[in-house]
Amino acid sequence: MKRFDQVVVVTLNPTIDRVLEVSDFRAGGHQRCVRRDRYPAGKGINVVRAMASLGQTATLTGFVGEAESEWYQQFLLGEGIEDCRLISVPGFTRENITVVDPNAPGSDTHLMEQGFTVMADELAQLRDSLGPLASAGNLVSFCGSLPPGVSAEQFAELIRLCLDSGAEVAVDTSGDSLRASARLPLWLVKPNRQELAELSGHTSQTDELLLSSASLLAEQIRWVLLSLGGEGAVLVDSRIARRAVLPLRTEEVVSTVGCGDILFGGFLAGWQGAEWKEGDLQEVPDPASEALRRGVAAATFAATQLTPTIALARVQALEPDVEISNTDLPDASRPNE
């Protein structure tokens, strides 16, 4: 294993996030915002922003509403994302509104819009642009939900196009698009606890069952990066499960919006920045574990911020405190019921 020649991030359904800080928020009546932020977001956007903040480059493609296209491009350029190839489509980029109450950690309120619809010719344009980007040695990462006009089967077809072109593919999505993509020979999939339980068909979410389900996925997917929120993350391959955790006190958590995306972006940045050597991944330090360490440190720092932003020096300062342990995998062929 080695770093990729190029990381390409595909965001099909980006957002504009508005974060409102309202002390003692309650539904009904009139309340004053203490702080307001507005910025491009969505899984793919958060991933490339995290990578740029941690010193690694990525190419961004996908769709954006034409009304926000120029603002998106300028904002991302200011974040150090120079290779932005988003395709403008008629309509508006959806907005997500998050209300954060600083006096009630963990009680964020989320309001989510539906955005533009992707037409057949626009999807064909994206398909044509992905071909040259999906060459051998590159990683194409599909991040986020599907917009109206793109089905789960069409999503899987985009993935197959990249695989057939020689690229490795990573996926961070949910629902039907996750189920469609999990059947393919991916390089990585990044579910959270609930998504993995739904994917495996189990209602229980015990650690033992989650690891069993992840190891079953790892029979055909190279890496399963399982996000566990405040309990850290687990990186599962065909041999071992690496668990990483960096606990936060409840009062330190400001907002968890986008932290799973930061975990993934931090992991990719750590992977690209690792000191790869000849031989297998059991060499010390283990590059996969170090990539996981960076991802968890980045996500933990992001949880202490109102918006999902990170600073390299602060993340590096947290990394020594990330605890990583290897876990024996249960028998993937006999998951517990």
Protein language model regions, located:
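Conserved phosphate-binding/catalytic loop of the ribokinase/pfkB sugar-kinase fold
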Residues: S88, T98-A136
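Positively charged, low-complexity intrinsically disordered leader regions
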Residues: M1-G28
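Short, conserved phosphate/pyrophosphate- and ester-handling motifs at nucleotide-, phospho-/glycolipid
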Residues: M51, N192, G260
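Substrate-binding N-lobe of the ribokinase-like
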Residues: R32-R94
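Conserved phosphate-binding/catalytic region of the ribokinase-like
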Residues: R179, D207-E337
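Short beta-strand scaffold segments in enzyme catalytic cores
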Residues: R49, E95-V99, G232-V236
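Conserved beta-alpha-beta core of the PfkB/ribokinase-like small-molecule kinase fold
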Residues: R127, L139-L209
